[in-house]
Amino acid sequence: MMENTFDDISWNFSTTNDITISLTYYGQVDKLIHHCDFFSGIKESLKNHITVQFVNDAAPDRGIFEDICKAYKNRFNLKSYTVKQDIGFNNHGCRNLAMLESETHWNWLIDIDVYFKEDLLEAMTNTALENNQFYVFKVRFDHYDNPEDYELFDEKKLLKWVAHPNVWLINKPCFWSTGGYDMEFAGMRHGDKEFFQAIDKKKYEHFLFHPMLEEEYDIHIQMPNRTKSYLNQITEHVGYLQKCVDFVKKRNDNKIRKHKKRLICFDWQRNV
């Protein structure tokens, strides 16, 4: 992999990008309402360039997700989908679905516990993005707010900023150069590393998104509750995980095979 250098990018603010933002939901009603209120309140000129897709990963919430999305459907460009089978952790399958349904070249894939400001959206829509690049983002750690924020990445709490492992500003050709997220990991919290490794590094390079270098743009992880968010997820310690990892790596090393893998293993419907 090429070494990432951040100081040699000439950021151009002369282009306006249409961007689709996709989030997966699994019963986090408060966070869903937060995002709906946030996107409802952004300036109209920005709304014209932003589409938001919520994908309900079969959360058993008695229709609350659908009701909320329908209540907000006229306040911003909103599309919502519901997966019909609860197969456990399926964030990556939902992302495959979102990318298949997206109508824009540029897409921001985030988790529903990611909070951000309008300034960040303005920067993404007003910056000339390079088609041979995809972008990662700083994560703000607020240990007073939530001492358990991503403890596995910073057990000694030495870091102030790291790149989030699952937040991408990425164009469609770059995303599909991976063949999509690997559905072999459905039900397990695994697959971020394999997705990153499957990106065609001969064509695409990753950069930290930082138009002003010293700007305060960041994303904040709000109360992730990672261990209890799915009712029936399989843990990463199941015996066959390593077999899945080995199989996926071998397949993704084959450019032909990785583009023939299944993208969705569930029924779904569009709500809004």
Residue spans for each PLM region:
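C-terminal catalytic/acceptor-binding lobe
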Residues: 186-272
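Conserved catalytic core of nucleotide-sugar-dependent glycosyltransferases
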Residues: 99, 117-184
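The conserved acidic donor/metal-binding loop of glycosyltransferases
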Residues: 111-115
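Cell-envelope/extracellular polymer assembly enzymes that use nucleotide-activated donors
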Residues: 17-22, 51, 194
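Glycine-rich, basic loop-to-helix element that forms the pyrophosphate-binding segment
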Residues: 85-101
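Short aromatic/hydrophobic "clamp" motif used to bind/position activated sugar donors
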Residues: 107
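Short, well-formed alpha-helical segments that are part of the catalytic scaffolds
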Residues: 28-43
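Acidic donor-binding segment of Leloir-type glycosyltransferases
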Residues: 39-85
